[in-house]
């Protein structure tokens, strides 16, 4: 089996490449770029056209689908059926009256956690997982679920790596076996709880028309997507707070005032998601021969959509490669919506976007009320496995307020 460090290095280098190519004016109005043999689109107008044309540009997650199928990696009527299983739960959980409950969950977990990055990460994970389970009327078992969650992340990392680098038969078989094993273990945990078993039955009833439907796969993929993106975003907020002391105190003062509106904090969260998009890129498969921005595409061809590039496009952002806590495009609400897509856009955008945004806002408030952060340096390092999180060992120090 491939060296984990090799897998991590290759995937991180792919994202570093996207950052290196972004934010620079190459003189082209639109058009595509290339990474190796892969065509990359990063102009907001082009990417907007792609994501709003799901019949022409279809989801294709290659070997990642060995972990299972869900609303995130299916198309057409099957996608619509899977979406309907979970969408009402997400919308209900994101209603404004639930904001206080979300705040209380994160505040309680952070109050009890160890004063360390690892402790805060665990508290954020536990809070986000609790909120996700509650959306489906369930109660999570924090520790065993955390272990399974980490296994899902590492399995997805390997599967994604093998989607780019052709594995040997032994490597492929091992990765698929591990994927099936973690899904089976998740299933055993869920089905041991009568409430979870009943909810999985509801999933199956709603998906009666899908051959081979697995409610466990649907649940696990939704869980991973929802929790991982929320936690990684708040981790990046913490990282940037540590690097911006004056900004941190301004945000603390704004939150401590207890006002319903926190425009500077909201701007800072947006700038964090712009600079460090939770999902840095997507891939799509072209369903039929087409031409986009003068680039000829053939049926079956894979293309990349660089969210990093969209978020740093110089036509749409002033000094896009600079992290600006007071970015005027956000303060003035003047940004082009096509150029800011942390939850994606179009008919296949993140179904839990409202809930995710609510969680991030409340988690950041809870973190800032309880902790102060500093950084010994401002070297940015990350760890990519579907979602973009800060690398472990970052030089962030913290203390309780």
Predicted regions, residues:
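Cytochrome P450 heme-thiolate "Cys pocket" and heme-binding signature region
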Residues: 81, 86, 329-365, 379-387
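Cytochrome P450 catalytic-core helices
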Residues: 227-254, 353-371
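Conserved cytochrome P450 catalytic core segment spanning the I/J/K helices
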Residues: 175-233
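Conserved cytochrome P450 K-helix E-x-x-R motif and the immediately C-terminal K′/meander segment
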Residues: 4-27, 258-293, 314
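Cytochrome P450 catalytic-domain helical core, especially the substrate-recognition surface
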Residues: 1-17, 61-137, 141-191, 401
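Conserved cytochrome P450 K-helix/beta-meander segment immediately N-terminal to the heme-binding cysteine loop
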Residues: 53-56, 305-332, 353
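N-terminal membrane-proximal hinge/A-helix region immediately C-terminal to the signal-anchor transmembrane segment
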Residues: 1-67, 339
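Cytochrome P450 I-helix active-site segment
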Residues: 1, 240-279, 293, 298-301, ...
């Amino acid at each position: 089996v491939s060296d984990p460090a090799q897998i991590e290095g290759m995937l991180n280098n792919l994202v570093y490449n996207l950052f290196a190519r972004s934010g620079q004016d190459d003189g082209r109005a639109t058009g595509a770029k290339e990474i190796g043999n892969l065509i990359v689109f990063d102009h907001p107008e082009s990417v907007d056209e792609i994501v709003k044309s799901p019949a022409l540009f279809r989801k294709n997650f290659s070997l990642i689908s060995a972990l299972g199928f869900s609303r995130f990696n299916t198309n057409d009527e099957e996608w619509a059926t899977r979406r309907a299983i979970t969408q009402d739960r997400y919308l209900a959980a994101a209603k404004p009256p639930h904001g206080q409950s979300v705040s209380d969950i994160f505040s309680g977990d952070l109050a009890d956690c160890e004063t360390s990055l690892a402790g805060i990460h665990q508290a954020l994970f536990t809070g986000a997982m609790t909120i996700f389970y509650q959306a489906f009327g369930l109660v999570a078992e924090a520790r065993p679920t955390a272990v399974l969650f980490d296994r899902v992340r590492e399995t997805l990392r390997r599967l994604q790596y093998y989607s780019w680098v052709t594995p040997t038969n032994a490597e492929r078989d091992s990765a698929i076996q591990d994927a099936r094993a973690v899904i089976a273990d998740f299933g055993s945990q869920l089905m041991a709880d009568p409430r979870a078993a009943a909810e999985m039955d509801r999933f199956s009833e709603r998906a009666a028309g899908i051959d081979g439907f697995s409610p466990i796969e649907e649940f696990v993929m939704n869980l991973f997507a929802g929790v991982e993106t929320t936690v990684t975003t708040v981790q990046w907020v913490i990282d940037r707070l540590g690097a911006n002391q004056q900004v941190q105190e301004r945000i603390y003062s704004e939150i401590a005032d207890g006002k319903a509106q926190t425009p500077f904090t909201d701007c800072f969260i947006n700038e964090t998601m712009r600079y460090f998009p939770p999902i840095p890129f997507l891939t799509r498969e072209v369903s039929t021969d087409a031409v986009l921005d003068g680039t000829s595409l053939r049926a079956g061809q894979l293309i990349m959509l660089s969210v990093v590039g969209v978020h740093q496009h110089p036509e749409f952002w002033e000094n896009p490669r600079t992290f600006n806590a007071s970015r005027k495009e956000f303060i003035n609400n003047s940004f082009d919506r096509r150029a800011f897509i942390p939850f994606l856009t179009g008919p296949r955008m993140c179904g839990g976007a409202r809930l995710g945004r609510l969680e991030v806002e409340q988690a950041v408030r809870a973190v800032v009320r309880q902790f102060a952060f500093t950084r010994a340096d401002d070297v940015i390092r990350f760890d990519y496995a579907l979602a973009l999180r800060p690398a472990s060992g970052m030089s962030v120090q913290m203390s309780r307020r």
